[in-house]
Swiss-Prot record:
Residues bearing the modification Sulfotyrosine: 1417, 1420, 1422
Domain NTR, residue spans: 1595-1742
Cysteine pairs bridged by disulfides in the record: 68-97, 635-669, 702-728, 703-735, 716-736, 1471-1535, 1583-1588, 1595-1673, 1618-1742, 1718-1727
Domain Anaphylatoxin-like: 702-736
Organism: Homo sapiens
Cross-link Isoglutamyl cysteine thioester (Cys-Gln) residue location(s): 1010-1013
Gene3D superfamilies: 1.50.10.20, 2.20.130.20, 2.40.50.120, 2.60.120.1540, 2.60.40.1930, 2.60.40.1940, 6.20.50.160, Alpha-macroglobulin, receptor-binding domain
Keyword Disulfide bond: yes
Name of the protein described by the UniProt record: Complement C4-A
GO biological processes: complement activation; complement activation, classical pathway; inflammatory response; innate immune response; positive regulation of apoptotic cell clearance
Length: 1744
């Protein structure tokens, strides 16, 4: 025996000695920049005692002489024949060796260098190498946002966590980018991360369209290391409660002869966890693969919720009947889904929420079968392991399910052998079945079925590897269960076939793209290898083993998934105390780690998950493991037909000198091709059939728009006439007429009740709908902070006021343990007893408001509660406030309580409602909300600008008149505000001007919805920054101003990107075609903003390229879709329009040349330069003709000067411009001249006297003068004419700092900043100003000492009583500016400029309050909506559109509202038109202030803007204002309509105002008042007697002629006149007529006798005087009668300059008795007493 073993050993040694020595080279197939690369080197078959030395390094294959990494030496021998080395490509080496220039097929070569290769192996070179894929990807970046969903205009807070390849914190520089829903990059920031955590925020532009935004981050030097997170942007409000639909089974089994009964549960719970009581309305439908929805008729159900739940059953018979109506059978359902929609109306407040179930599939089996872990390669003669995963249709593992396998083994020349095996799945739904494989196998066919009697079936065919190979290696796994971290995995290695002779198996373990371990194991009959699974091997790894047989490697591999467990470190969040908390309470949050770590925290309202898409989930460990596994280079479960295939599939690169793996082409694995069967289900539904007639998406959209109803009456023909695209008009008209005929048939059938509601519901579902909106006014997230935690820490947190469930997230970052995401902690915040209060956005003084707080009692006891409104100044309340109502609130129910309130003071009043329980049950709650109370009438603004020049003696004293507007409301207590500055540059461009917190956008009182208006966020701030940079004056402003300026610019950049098209052009509205003018405007500004916004130069180059496409053959530019129809931005006519546009684009293209820095853009740059030259020729030709108007001449001169056009062209343009200049004193400006349409504007010269205010010029004059100033500065620098033009421009600025509109403001600030840069001086000059006035509070004086280095004057102190003269004295040696702003409310609009523009607003509809103040909702029962299963329920229990209206309006993003009986709904009609002789400068805006307490239905406004027959370009809602944008105002009357809803009852509603104005010339406007519908409850009295009495406390009381109670008093009239209140006037007047003025009544009278006067020195008999009284007061003076009126002087004057008088509680009003009455015996004495008073008071007055 000993001899036999010796022979065998000698034989094997002899065989080994005959094998060829070689060097094996292993590496991951991808090299990552800056990341260690594990490299395996091994000697194979070298003679005993052989030592081999060498080195490995990386190099560029095309530049062999430059290494890309440092060299690493190795020494190998026959005894130590392998080594695992580490290489790295540093960034500096990657650049020096040229790797960053490898744009196509970036490869790097792994090289082993050893003299042994040439000396011992007779190679031609001492180099052996292999090509690897090069990637700049490295490390891990994880991103986190504070919410999964945001409203437009909301702030997004986010974090970036940086880790290296080993999941340890990385301090590096990263680049963060934000993309909007169109995929356009709107923000880019590069930051260094010293703590490995970066936190930042940004604001989503409020004009953003709904969609998914993305934040991505990468290491700045690693372009491929990109990581991202997404969040949803849409308009939403948080749900009050959440609805869930849970099917009884997660599938519906449909096989021939079998159909499951369909059962489901509906659950509704408030966000704070309590069940909802109410009614569920459920509908069913079908969803196909494309998400197309069709509803079943007749399957609707309505049922009560009991304890927040309801059970619904749908029988097989009912369902089949519904299918037959669609001409479908059960066999047609495969692959479709049953759609379920549930609408829940909760009983206490009638609020509605909805839910959908879209994942209920019709299936042929209740299981799915996954064979992806089964290898696609087999080893002949070794067991083949079938690995299957069985899941239920819900996605959860199916345990204990029988799996049957039929394995057919085919071998050449023999009958196929069939093996039938059955095994049940384990607890994780998996099964591992070994199949015996003969050595002669050619093919293995597997048929696998799971479950019974309706199994899931899968088939798999595995071909045997080619025969004649060197043998096979089998890797067998005794335990097929996935190991956990900390387990030891045992594997068996066995060589199969070919009698292989070798001494050792070599094996490697690869994880996360690296070789983490390399070893060898001596060959035995059954060789076992143990692998310890640590954190480095999670979440998966490849085990690769091989040996050599002769000159051929034999290999196999196995992918091992590690059970996803916790993170490497530890982070646990926990809270002390109860499961339930109260709002405002403190809670202790415990943070526990196992090492020093940074812990990032965040808390959000779980209602956000209900409001947003289910796909946007917070960061968790599953996502972390997924990111870690993304570095895995292996593809598939392992194995291969050859060793090279095995290595490649495991992600290895290999070379032994004779054979090698091919270089990898991409990071990802090749994807399997999948096909999806398409179904064409024949849905027999009228509208769907109609839609199906149109093939193109555009035509279908037009058809859908035609089907949609408008909120106003229009015929289909009228609507179609507004559709601009001809190819859209036909389908729109056809579908509109078709839908109208369907509606008519439906009306003719007289459908009513629920069935009619269902018809409309189904019709509404044809329309593309937004997601369901819901309500909230509370913080949606908090606790956004990072804490340093050393193993344990306790934080004390104070919970917000929301009643909801908060979810607290935590993520830790440790230097030793890496990243860990904790399991979130949920905090339920709830009060068993609480109240809910709604308030309107605003009300006006003396309107009447009904508060209806709702009390919720979730206790199991009835509560007697005391409710009151706390007293507050400015509100009339019952009992003066504090008077409580006693209310019984039964257990588990809610009850509303009514309070009437009348506001009497204009202010923001904090209104507090308090509810308290009894002594036995001391519960309570209080809610405080701010009620905004406005003054009556409409706001009117008036501005005056004065130049202060102490060097001119005529301007050293000024008198600012105090004249008041006769329309001003009589008791407004208004002020004049004065602003003084000695530094116009810093005042206009500093922290109080362009760099103020809101930027210039806050300085213009204009909306900002369209593309051009958006630029106001950006352009002026750039001008200000440029001025402050050039003059080095940032230090004169607050320290944070520069950061704020950059932030403003970045916000503006984000906003304008919402209007960008894919070709680089821009449009005024998101739905419009591109505009040449707007695109040029954006190009100019963004080219200047490149440094601040970090935008892509390529994007701006695309914009320049698009502009070139708009140039005509003669050099001019065209605008296929002007931003506005205003004859090219300035009221120009004829030739001026084309010239001005060409000049404007030329200026933009010139500025855009700055972005052409890279060599690749040189050809386009040359085209741009040629285009500019061509345009200059066109401009020069037109200027030479001498026919241009002032605006075209100015912009042409500037364009030619800026682009350095030929001197002869410049000279002509300059002379033409200067010939049009107008000079008055020290002012130079350009106004209306021949050729300009603005001749219609009256000339506005400069002031004739230095003490006169500067007349305010129209926007076009400002813009023209600004272009002229820009030209002068380039043409001759800071000379006299530039001084004069800048002086005129400076004085045209408004009180806030802007000018008239967007364009003139942008250009004026651009010109002034350029001038101020040129004229900047460090010389300090002073200005002394004294202002004095005598007003309501006596004499007031201010002395100011200013200098030209100060930011601003003390304008916050400079307030003077409106109507009082202000005297100004000026001294010093510096010029300055004084601006006066007067803001007051007016009674009517009769003096507005409604000659050119006209607007009319009418309101129809009335309010019906059907709910009594003491009505309650016992046990949340909803008796008006009986359950379907109630046998006593009437057939049609629902008002026809009650459910539908709630659903439709909420579908359109409306806030929840109570049911229709509680709503106050009106219909608005807004009509506009203009004088046909007057042209507009373009876009017009109708600003409609809604009646108090109302908000417009967004659904109606969206229909006006979003359909093909667009009526309004855009709309905005700001508080009580609705802004409607019109492209133009027609000469004939055009009307639009929408509905508005008043959620909180308001009585005695006062008229509101509406204004139509020209956006580019806001002075051209028309303003009107409109009122509530007559005979409407809106005009009714809501207050209780006591509150009414309080509200009327300031009203005058009419003394009836000869009242008996007063006759007994001696001298009662004289006491009133002379003692208290001591009147200031006394007249006997005759009333001529009564007139309504906003919230007042005006009585026009004629004086018959003057008894007394103070201020009214011109009062005399037969003169006219006006008396005013509030419309809310009862006083009515009858025309034709005479009255004795005494009282206090008024603050306002009529049109003749005579005082007007307000009648109030300090007024005496007494009707004069007739002569006939005085002749009666009974009244003779009283009349004598009255006549005595008139005689005595009229002649002697008061004797005190």
């Amino acid at each position: 025996m000993r001899l036999l073993w010796g022979l065998i050993w000698a034989s094997s040694f002899f065989t080994l000695s005959l094998q060829k020595p070689r060097l094996l080279l292993f590496s991951p197939s991808v090299v990552h920049l800056g990341v260690p690369l594990s490299v395996g080197v091994q000697l194979q078959d070298v003679p005993r005692g052989q030592v081999v030395k060498g080195s490995v390094f990386l190099r560029n294959p095309s530049r062999n002489n430059v290494p890309c990494s440092p060299k690493v030496d190795f020494t190998l021998s026959s005894e130590r024949d392998f080594a695992l080395l580490s290489l790295q490509v540093p960034l500096k080496d990657a650049k020096s060796c040229g790797l960053h220039q490898l744009l196509r097929g970036p490869e790097v070569q792994l090289v082993a260098h050893s003299p042994w290769l040439k000396d011992s192996l007779s190679r031609t070179t001492n180099i052996q190498g292999i090509n690897l894929l090069f990637s700049s990807r490295r490390g891990h970046l994880f991103l986190q946002t504070d919410q999964p969903i945001y409203n437009p205009g909301q702030r997004v807070r986010y974090r970036v966590f940086a880790l290296d390849q080993k999941m340890r914190p990385s301090t590096d520089t990263i680049t963060v980018m934000v993309e909007n829903s169109h995929g356009l990059r709107v923000r880019k920031k590069e930051v260094y991360m010293p703590s490995s955590i970066f936190q930042d925020d940004f604001v989503i532009p409020d004009i953003s369209e709904p969609g998914t935004w993305k934040i991505s981050a990468r290491f700045s030097d690693g372009l491929e290391s990109n990581s991202s997170t997404q969040f949803e942007v849409k308009k939403y409000v948080l749900p009050n409660f959440e609805v869930k639909i849970t099917p009884g089974k997660p599938y519906i089994l449909t096989v021939p002869g079998h159909l499951d009964e369909m059962q489901l549960d509906i659950q509704a719970r408030y966000i704070y966890g309590k069940p909802v009581q109410g009614v569920a309305y459920v509908r069913f439908g079908l969803l196909d693969e494309d998400g197309k929805k069709t509803f079943f008729r007749g399957l609707e159900s309505q049922t009560k919720l009991v304890n927040g739940q309801s059970h619904i059953s749908l029988s097989k018979a009912e369902f089949q009947d519904a299918l037959e109506k669609l001409n479908m059978g059960i066999t047609d359902l495969q692959g479709l889904r049953l759609y379920v929609a549930a609408a829940i109306i909760e009983s206490p407040g009638g609020e509605m929420e909805e839910a959908e179930l879209t994942s209920w599939y019709f299936v042929s089996s209740p299981f799915s079968l996954d064979l992806s872990k089964t290898k696609r390669h087999l080893v002949p003669g070794a067991p083949f392991l079938l690995q299957a995963l069985v899941r239920e249709m819900s996605g959860s593992p199916a345990s204990g399910i029988p799996v049957k396998v039929s394995a057919t083994v085919s071998s050449p020349g023999s009958v196929p052998e069939v093996q039938d095996i059955q095994q049940n799945t384990d607890g994780s739904g998996q099964v591992s079945i070994p199949i015996i494989i003969p050595q002669t196998i050619s093919e293995l066919q597997l048929s696998v079925s799971a479950g019974s009697p309706h199994p899931a079936i899968a088939r798999l065919t595995v071909a045997a590897p080619p025969s004649g190979g060197p043998g096979f290696l089998s890797i067998e796994r005794p335990d097929s269960r996935p190991p956990r971290v900390g387990d030891t995995l045992n594997l068996n290695l066995r060589a199969v076939g070919s009698g292989a002779t070798f001494s050792h198996y070599y094996y490697m373990i690869l994880s996360r793209g690296q070789i983490v371990f390399m070893n060898r194991e001596p060959k035995r009959t059954l060789t076992s290898v143990s692998v310890f699974v640590d954190h480095h091997l999670a979440p998966s790894f490849y085990f690769v083993a091989f040996y050599y047989h002769g000159d051929h490697p034999v290999a196999n591999s196995l992918r091992v998934d590690v059970q996803a467990g916790a993170c490497e470190g530890k982070l646990e969040l926990s809270v002390d105390g109860a499961k339930q908390y109260r709002n405002g309470e403190s809670v202790k949050l415990h943070l526990e780690t196992d090492s020093l770590a940074l812990v990032a925290l965040g808390a959000l309202d779980t209602a956000l998950y209900a409001a947003g898409s289910k796909s946007h989930k917070p960061l968790n460990m599953g996502k972390v493991f997924e990111a870690m596994n993304s570095y895995d280079l292996g593809c598939g479960p392992g194995g291969g037909d050859s060793a090279l295939q095995v290595f490649q599939a495991a992600g290895l690169a290999f070379s032994d000198g004779d054979q090698w793996t091919l270089s990898r082409k991409r990071l990802s694995c090749p994807k399997e091709k999948t096909t999806r069967k398409k179904r064409n289900v024949n849905f027999q539904k009228a509208i769907n059939e109609k839609l199906g007639q149109y093939a193109s998406p555009t035509a279908k959209r037009c058809c859908q728009d035609g089907v949609t109803r408008l909120p106003m009456m229009r015929s289909c023909e009228q609507r179609a006439a507004r559709v601009q695209q001809p190819d859209c008009r036909e389908p729109f008209l056809s579908c509109c007429q078709f839908a109208e005929s369907l509606r008519k048939k439906s009306r003719d059938k007289g459908q009513a009740g629920l069935q009619r509601a269902l018809e409309i519901l189904q019709e509404e579902d044809l329309i593309d709908e937004d997601d369901i909106p819901v309500r909230s006014f509370f913080p949606e997230n908090w606790l956004w902070r990072v804490e340093t935690v050393d193993r344990f820490q306790i934080l004390t947190l104070w919970l917000p006021d929301s009643l909801t469930t908060w979810e607290i997230h935590g993520l830790s970052l440790s230097k030793t343990k890496g990243l860990c995401v904790a399991t979130p902690v949920q905090l339920r915040v709830f009060r068993e007893f609480h109240l809910h209060l709604r308030l309107p956005m605003s009300v006006r003084r003396f309107e009447q408001l009904e508060l209806r707080p709702v009390l919720y009692n979730y206790l199991d006891k009835n509560l007697t509660v005391s409710v009151h409104v706390s007293p507050v100044e400015g509100l009339c309340l019952a009992g003066g406030g504090g008077l409580a109502q006693q209310v019984l609130v039964p257990a588990g129910s809610a009850r509303p309580v009514a309070f009437s309130v009348v506001p009497t003071a204009a202010a923001a009043v904090s209104l507090k409602v308090v509810a308290r329980g009894s002594f036995e049950f001391p519960v309570g709650d209080a809610v405080s909300k701010v009620l905004q109370i406005e003054k009556e009438g409409a706001i009117h603004r008036e501005e005056l600008v004065y130049e202060l020049n102490p060097l001119d003696h005529r301007g050293r004293t000024l008198e600012i008149p105090g004249n008041s507007d006769p329309n001003m409301i009589p008791d407004g207590d208004f002020n004049s505000y004065v602003r003084v500055t000695a530094s116009d540059p810093l005042d206009t461009l500093g922290s109080e001007g362009a760099l103020s917190p809101g930027g210039v956008a806050s300085l213009l009182r204009l909306p900002r919805g369209c593309g051009e208006q958006t630029m106001i966020y950006l352009a002026p701030t750039l001008a200000a920054s440029r001025y402050l940079d050039k003059t080095e004056q940032w230090s004169t402003l607050p320290p944070e101003t520069k950061d704020h300026a950059v932030d403003l610019i970045q916000k503006g950049y984000m906003r304008i990107q919402q209007f960008r098209k894919a070709d680089g052009s821009y449009a005024a509205w998101l739905s419009r075609d591109s505009s040449t003018w707007l695109t040029a405007f954006v190009l100019k500004v963004l080219s200047l903003a490149q440094e601040q916004v970090g935008g892509s130069p390529e994007k701006l180059q695309e914009t320049s390229n698009w502009l070139l496409s708009q140039q005509q053959a003669d050099g001019s530019f065209q605008d296929p879709c002007p931003v506005l129809d205003r004859s090219m931005q300035g009221g120009l006519v004829g030739n001026d329009e084309t010239v001005a546009l060409t000049a404007f684009v030329t200026i933009a293209l010139h500025h855009g040349l700055a972005v052409f820095q890279d060599e690749g853009a040189e050809p386009l740059k040359q085209r741009v330069e040629a285009s500019i030259s061509k345009a200059n020729s066109f401009l020069g030709e037109k200027a030479s003709a001498g026919l241009l108007g002032a605006h075209a001449a100015a912009i042409t001169a500037y364009a030619l000067t800026l682009t350095k056009a030929p001197v002869d062209l410049l000279g002509v343009a300059h002379n033409n411009l200067m010939a049009m200049a107008q000079e008055t004193g020290d002012n130079l400006y350009w106004g209306s001249v021949t050729g300009s349409q603005s001749n219609a504007v009256s000339p506005t010269p400069a002031p004739r006297n230095p003490s006169d205010p500067m007349p305010q010029a129209p926007a076009l004059w400002i813009e023209t003068t600004a272009y002229a100033l820009l030209h002068l500065l380039l043409h001759e620098g800071k000379a006299e004419m530039a001084d004069q033009a800048s002086a005129w421009l400076t004085r045209q600025g408004s009180f806030q700092g802007g000018f008239r509109s967007t364009q003139d403001t942008v250009i004026a600030l651009d010109a002034l900043s350029a001038y101020w840069i040129a004229s900047h001086t460090t010389e300090e000059r002073g200005l002394n100003v004294t202002l004095s006035s005598t007003g309501r509070n006596g004499f007031k004086s201010h002395a100011l000492q200013l200098n030209n280095r100060q930011i601003r004057g003390l304008e916050e102190e400079l307030q003077f009583s409106l109507g009082s003269k202000i005297n100004v004295k000026v001294g010093g040696n510096s010029k300055g500016t004084l601006k006066v702003l007067r803001t007051y409310n007016v009674l009517d609009m009769k003096n507005t400029t409604c000659q050119d523009l006209q607007i009319e607003v009418t309101v129809k509809g009335h309010v019906e309050y059907t709910m009594e103040a003491n009505e309650d909702y016992e046990d949340y029962e909803y008796d008006e909506l009986p359950a379907k299963d109630d046998p006593d329920a009437p057939l049609q229990p629902v008002t026809p559109l009650q459910l539908f209206e709630g659903r439709r309006n909420r579908r359109r993003r409306e806030a929840p509202k109570v049911v229709e009986e509680q709503e106050s709904r009106v219909h608005y009609t807004v009509c506009i038109w203009r004088n046909g002789k007057v042209g507009l400068s373009g876009m017009a805006i109708a600003d409609v202030t809604l009646l108090s307490g109302f908000h417009a239905l967004r659904a109606d406004l969206e229909k006006l803007t979003s359909l093909s027959d667009r009526y309004v370009s855009h709309f905005e809602t700001e508080g009580p204002h609705v802004l409607l944008y019109f492209d133009s105002v027609p000469t004939s009357r055009e009307c639009v309509g929408f509905e508005a809803v008043q959620e909180v009852p308001v009585g005695l509603v006062q008229p509101a105002s509406a204004t139509l104005y020209d956006y580019y010339n806001p002075e051209r406007r028309c303003s009107v008042f409109y009122g509530a519908p007559s005979k409407s409850r809106l005009l009714a009295t809501l207050c209780s007697a006591e509150v009414c009495q309080c509200a009327e406390g300031k009203c005058p009381r009419q003394r009836r002629a000869l009242e008996r109670g007063l006759q007994d008093e001696d001298g009662y009239r004289m006491k009133f006149a002379c003692y208290y209140p001591r009147v200031e006037y006394g007249f006997q007047v005759k009333v001529l007529r009564e007139d309504s003025r906003a919230a007042f009544r005006l009585f026009e009278t004629k004086i018959t006798q003057v008894l007394h006067f103070t201020k009214d020195v011109k009062a005399a008999a037969n003169q006219m005087r006006n008396f005013l009284v509030r419309a809310s007061c009862r006083l009515r003076l009858e025309p034709g009668k005479e009255y004795l009126i005494m009282g206090l002087d008024g603050a306002t004057y009529d049109l003749e300059g005579h005082p007007q008088y307000l009648l109030d509680s300090n007024s005496w009003i007494e009707e004069m008795p007739s002569e006939r009455l005085c002749r009666s015996t009974r009244q003779r004495a009283a009349c004598a007493q009255l006549n005595d008073f008139l005689q005595e008071y009229g002649t002697q007055g008061c004797q005190v």
